[in-house]
Regions:
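Heme-based O2/NO sensor domains and their adjacent alpha-helical segments
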Residues: 2-5, 18-99, 105, 112, ...
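Internal, conserved structured core segments that host functional sites
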Residues: 114-117
Length: 128
């Protein structure tokens, strides 16, 4: 019988998602539009939340839901102005992070497709 492996396992598990999130937040830390959206001075708590969410989404441990409940992504982002500029900046930093992983083409495409759809879904205003 063949063991079915999750996307999380296929791309390398926790180390892959740690690297993705670390690379992403390196960009966010210097971004004048995105950085103010994070309430903590240190981006560490936000990075951990994103890492746990992505790990769970892709078939890894369920720690995110155990600690925070249902993801409710749109609701959690509602207090912030997520306009097309913020979305595009988020995607630019995430593109750099995804590229740093050097995943096989199908895995890269699968991950990137999800991230793009998620970013577009978070837009909650077209105002500045």
């Amino acid at each position: 019988m063949t063991e079915i492996r999750s996307f999380y396992d296929e791309v390398g598990g926790r180390p892959t998602f740690e690297k993705l999130v670390a690379e992403f937040y390196r960009g966010v830390a210097g971004d004048p539009v995105l950085k103010p959206m994070y309430p903590e001075e240190d981006l560490g708590p936000a990075a951990l939340r994103l890492q746990l969410f992505l790990e769970q989404y892709w078939g890894g441990p369920g720690t995110y839901s155990e600690e925070r409940g249902h993801p409710r992504l749109r609701l959690r982002h509602q207090p912030f102005t997520v306009n097309p500029d913020a979305r595009d900046r988020w995607l630019a930093h995430m593109r750099t992070a995804v590229d740093s992983l050097e995943l096989p083409p199908l895995a890269e495409e699968t991950l990137w497709d999800y991230l793009q759809r998620a970013a577009f879904a978070m837009v909650n205003t077209f105002d500045d």
